[in-house]
Amino acid sequence: MTVNPKQTTFTRKRYNTLAALYDAMEFGIERRQFQRWRQHLWQDVQGPRVLEIGVGTGKNIPFYPPRVFVTGIDLAEKMLAKALLRMQTIDSRNNALLLMDAQTMAFSDATFDEVVSTFVFCSVPDPVLGLKEALRVVKPGGRLLMLEHMLAEPPALARAMTYVDPAIHWMMGVHIARPTVEHVAAAGWLIDQVTPLSYGAIFRRIIAHKPN
């Protein structure tokens, strides 16, 4: 599997364009649901060395546990710039933010103890490739902790999501009809838990680990 330069460039440009308004666009759902889900996910992080894929504007930064070293990466420099501002609001001595493509990470094999991502693999151009890279850079037995929105379980809703997915992707750079649980397994992760968080299981929490 290789990176698709055209799709990767499109995604980077789309999120750089959206960066200025991104937090405002998600303000409502962030306050109602996402914030609570993020906090609960990060409470389960053990570390000590953690990779956050797709740090975005830094919405997870307030929940970084003080006992771990978090390295956050993002594809879009304007999103990362906002995350750097958020990093200044916490004790950031144990953390780092880097501009990097999740599909081609510069880290050595088995660098991290855990990988965290929240609402990211809906926009990675090749999600299986990105998840394979995550598997490569985590230690044997290391965990993947995810929040993600994906293709709904009810057939009628799934068909509707699939129908509008191309338009949503063009406007927002995100896919809303991906079978993300299948992608995690296809990348080589062993799935431990999938927890539906909303109607139709559109939003789910996924916990998986790398085989020893």
Regions found by a protein language model. Name each.
Residues 103-115:
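A short acidic, Gly/Pro-enriched loop at the edge of an enzyme's catalytic core
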Residues 6-9, 28, 145-199, 203:
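C-terminal alpha-helical "lid/dimerization" subdomain adjacent to the S-adenosyl-L-methionine
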Residues 1-20:
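N-terminal, positively charged/glycine-rich alpha-helical extensions of SAM-dependent methyltransferases
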Residues 30-48, 59, 63:
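Conserved alpha-helix/loop element of class I SAM-dependent methyltransferases that forms part
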Residues 128-140:
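A short glycine-rich, Lys/Arg-flanked "PGG" loop and its adjoining helix->strand segment in the class I
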Residues 69, 141-143:
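Short glycine-centered segments of the SAM/dcSAM-binding site in methyltransferase folds
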Residues 114-126:
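A short SAM/SAH-binding and catalytic strip from SAM-dependent methyltransferases
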Residues 49-104:
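Class I SAM-dependent methyltransferase SAM/SAH-binding core
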